[in-house]
């Protein structure tokens, strides 16, 4: 119950792109991102440190790095345009910043899909305080 309350509070601050990212993950994987990825291992959700625990956590690490390269953009807030054609995610629009944000999210959603088979339930709701190794470089 405490986790659901925390998720509800966090959602109050979710705007634009993060909600789109949630939808993109849901469409790609069929999983509910808030319960599947929000508190997964060391890099999924807010913040990140230590060594990624598995392939799914590495998807989140790479996504964080991708956002980190977009210094002139607001990746957590900017709304972008995308569509799904067959099973492909297609980023659209004319704004280069928004398109790059979409591409970061697309890569993560596809990464999650490709690693569904190695998703480890033991890392769901993982305490970030256990992520003590040195973080790899992007």
UniProtKB/Swiss-Prot annotation:
- Annotated localization: Secreted
Explain the purpose of this protein. Answer: Snake venom phospholipase A2 (PLA2) that displays edema-inducing activities, exhibits indirect hemolytic activity, and inhibits ADP-induced platelet aggregation. PLA2 catalyzes the calcium-dependent hydrolysis of the 2-acyl groups in 3-sn-phosphoglycerides.
Question: Binding positions for Ca(2+)?
Answer: 43, 45, 47, 64
Species of the source: Protobothrops mucrosquamatus (Taiwan habu)
Q: Which UniProt keywords apply?
A: Calcium, Disulfide bond, Hemostasis impairing toxin, Hydrolase, Lipid degradation, Lipid metabolism, Metal-binding, Platelet aggregation inhibiting toxin, Secreted, Signal, Toxin
**Catalytic activity annotated for this protein?**
a 1,2-diacyl-sn-glycero-3-phosphocholine + H2O = a 1-acyl-sn-glycero-3-phosphocholine + a fatty acid + H(+)
Q: What residues make up the catalytic site?
A: 63, 105
Q: Member of which family?
A: Belongs to the phospholipase A2 family. Group II subfamily. D49 sub-subfamily.
**Which InterPro entries would you find in this protein's record?**
PLipase_A2, PLipase_A2_Asp_AS, PLipase_A2_dom, PLipase_A2_dom_sf, PLipase_A2_His_AS
Pfam families from the entry?
Answer: Phospholip_A2_1
Give the protein name, as stated in the record: Acidic phospholipase A2 2
């Amino acid at each position: 119950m405490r986790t659901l309350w925390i998720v509800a509070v966090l959602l109050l601050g979710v705007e634009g792109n993060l909600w789109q990212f949630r939808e993109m993950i849901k469409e790609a994987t069929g999983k509910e991102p808030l319960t599947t990825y929000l508190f997964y291992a060391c890099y999924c959700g807010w913040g990140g440190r230590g060594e990624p625990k598995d392939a799914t956590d590495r998807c989140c690490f790479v996504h964080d790095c991708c956002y980190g390269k977009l210094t002139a953009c607001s990746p957590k807030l900017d709304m972008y345009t995308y569509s799904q054609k067959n099973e492909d995610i297609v980023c659209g629009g004319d704004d280069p910043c928004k398109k790059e944000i979409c591409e970061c999210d697309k890569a993560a959603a596809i990464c999650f899909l490709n690693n569904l088979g190695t998703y480890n339930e033991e890392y769901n709701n993982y305490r970030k305080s256990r992520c003590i190794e040195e973080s790899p470089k992007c």
